[in-house]
Amino acid sequence: MTYSSDKADENALRVSMAYITAKGDIITKSGDTSSAENSDLYGMNAALLVTHGGHGAFTDAKISSTGNGATGAYGYSKGTYINLTNAQVSTTGAQAAGVEVSQRAMMKVEASTVTTTGDQSPAIRISQN
């Protein structure tokens, strides 16, 4: 499957209170956030957002984003879990982390490549845990 969004403050794929298992999916996001704070704290504008106890297992996924505040994969809130295996994550833009978790979400990144280009855009960011 391919998921994409070019709208500001929107996720290409959002998993909330649900479970998803996917192989070979392509997730792309372009566009700047209207609020760097909301992007950093809640995953607004991320390509992939898993939230509110959702679980996402992605194998061989290609996740890319272009834009300020456009994080690649973001997990938010207690009980949320993301598993990325053999994934390729790339972001271009300021404040666009490769992968990020906050509010006690958990993420496992295994045998994957995470690359970022932009100011304040670490490959991995953990906040408010």
Where are these regions (language model features)?
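Peripheral, non-catalytic segments of secretory and membrane proteins
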Residues: 84-87, 102, 109-114, 124-127
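A short, hydrophobic secondary-structure junction motif
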Residues: 44-62
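Beta-rich extracellular carbohydrate-active architectures
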Residues: 2-5, 26-32, 63-65, 88-91, ...
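Extracellular beta-strand/beta-solenoid scaffold signature
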Residues: 7-14, 35-49, 67-76, 92-101, ...
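A cross-taxa feature marking solvent-exposed loop/turn segments within ectodomains of secreted
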Residues: 6, 20, 56, 66-68, ...
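All-beta strand scaffolds that present successive hydrophobic residues in beta-strands
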Residues: 1, 19-25, 55-61, 81-86, ...
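Extracellular beta-helix/beta-solenoid repeat scaffolds
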Residues: 2-37, 45, 56
